[in-house]
A protein has these predicted regions:
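Electropositive, beta-rich accessory/interaction domains or terminal extensions
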Residues: 1-130
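Conserved mixed alpha/beta catalytic, RNA-binding, or beta-rich assembly cores of soluble enzyme
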Residues: 116, 127, 135-143
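A common structural junction motif
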Residues: 151-158
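N-terminal beta-hairpin/loop module of FHA
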Residues: 161-181
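A basic, amphipathic helix-loop patch mediating RNA/tRNA/ribosome contacts
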Residues: 178-227, 244
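Short, charged beta-turn/beta-strand-edge "cap" motif at the junction between a beta-strand
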Residues: 235-240
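Single conserved hydrophobic/aromatic residue that forms the stacking wall/gate
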Residues: 252-261
Length: 261
C-alpha cells in the first residue's frame, strides 16, 4: 500500500496518531482481503476514517448507520463483503438499580467504568440515561467483564443485563440557541462569555484538561476556535459555534450540566 502523504494536510497534528492507526487497518484489509472492525471511535475519528476509506477505495460502514449513536464502530472491508448489524459485535447492557433512591448520572457511570474496571474508553460506547434507567453500549467480547466487575455505582447496588437494541433509551438532548458577546475567539475568552466565568476560571478548566474541542483535549488557553467547532466542558455541557457575527457569536448549547466526555 502506498501512503498518500497529502491526506495528513487536511487534518491537525493531533489527528496524526489516529490517521496512522487508520492506515494500519486499511493495510490489513488489503493484505488479508478480509474486513476489519474498529473499536469505538468518536465522530471526528469517524470522519477521518471515512476519508481514508474513500481515498483507498475500501468499503465503509458505520454502526451508526444501523443504530444512531455518537460513539460508533466501523467496518472497513473489501468489495465482496456485505455488513450486517451483528458484524459490529456490539451489545447493549441495561444497568439495573433501585431508581427510587437515587438517579444514576452519566458522569458516575463513566467514572466507575474507568476507575473500577481500568479499561480503555474504546471498549465501550455511548452511556444512555434518563430519569429511571441507564444503559451502555459495549464490545460484545467484554460483556462478562462488565457484568462481573461492576456491582456497585457510588452507593447503589447494580446489575448489568443485556437487552435488545430496540429497548435503548432515546437521547433527549435539548440544544438552545444563544448569542454572546466575544472579545476574541481564544478558547478561554469564548468560554468565559458562554459559561459566565472569569478568564482565570476558564483557564483553570483548560489547564485541568476539562475542555475538549472536536473531541481533543486542549491545554492552551489561547487556542483559537472557529465556526463549526464543538466544545465540551466537563460538568458544564457542550456548545457549538454556529456563526461569527463580528462582535457576537451564535452558539448551540446543551443547557443542563452533563459530563459526556
Amino acid at each position: 500500500m502506498t501512503v498518500n502523504r497529502a491526506i495528513y494536510q487536511h487534518f491537525s497534528q493531533d489527528d496524526i496518531p489516529f490517521i496512522d492507526k487508520g492506515l494500519e487497518w486499511i493495510k490489513r484489509v488489503e493484505d488479508t482481503y478480509a474486513p476489519v472492525l474498529t473499536p469505538f471511535i468518536n465522530p471526528h475519528q469517524e470522519q477521518i476514517l471515512r476519508v481514508l476509506a474513500g481515498t483507498y477505495g475500501l468499503g465503509y460502514q458505520s454502526s451508526g448507520d444501523f443504530l444512531p449513536t455518537e460513539s460508533v464502530r466501523v467496518l472497513l472491508y473489501p468489495d465482496y463483503f456485505e455488513p450486517e448489524i451483528s458484524d459490529f459485535e456490539m451489545a447493549l447492557l441495561e444497568i439495573c438499580y433501585p431508581s427510587k433512591f437515587e438517579q444514576l448520572s452519566h458522569g458516575k457511570i463513566l467514572g466507575t467504568i474507568i476507575n473500577q474496571l481500568g479499561i480503555d474508553r474504546k471498549l465501550f460506547g455511548d452511556i444512555l440515561v434518563d430519569e429511571k434507567r441507564a444503559q451502555i453500549f459495549v464490545n460484545r467480547d467484554f460483556i462478562p467483564l462488565f457484568q462481573d466487575g461492576i456491582r456497585k455505582i457510588g452507593r447503589l447496588p447494580v446489575s448489568l443485563e443485556e437487552c435488545p437494541f430496540t429497548d435503548r433509551i432515546l437521547s433527549k438532548i435539548d440544544y438552545r440557541e444563544r448569542e454572546i458577546l466575544v472579545s476574541s475567539f481564544r478558547l478561554d475568552a469564548l468560554l468565559s462569555s458562554a459559561l459566565k466565568l472569569s478568564r482565570n476560571q476558564t483557564s483553570q478548566l483548560i489547564e485541568k484538561k476539562s475542555v475538549q474541542v472536536n473531541y481533543h483535549v486542549v491545554e492552551k488557553s489561547d487556542y483559537q476556535v472557529a465556526v463549526g467547532d464543538l466544545i465540551s466542558v466537563r460538568k458544564f455541557g457542550r456548545l457549538k459555534i454556529v456563526k461569527d457575527n463580528g462582535q457576537t457569536c451564535l452558539l448551540y448549547t446543551s443547557p443542563s450540566p452533563r459530563d459526556r466526555t
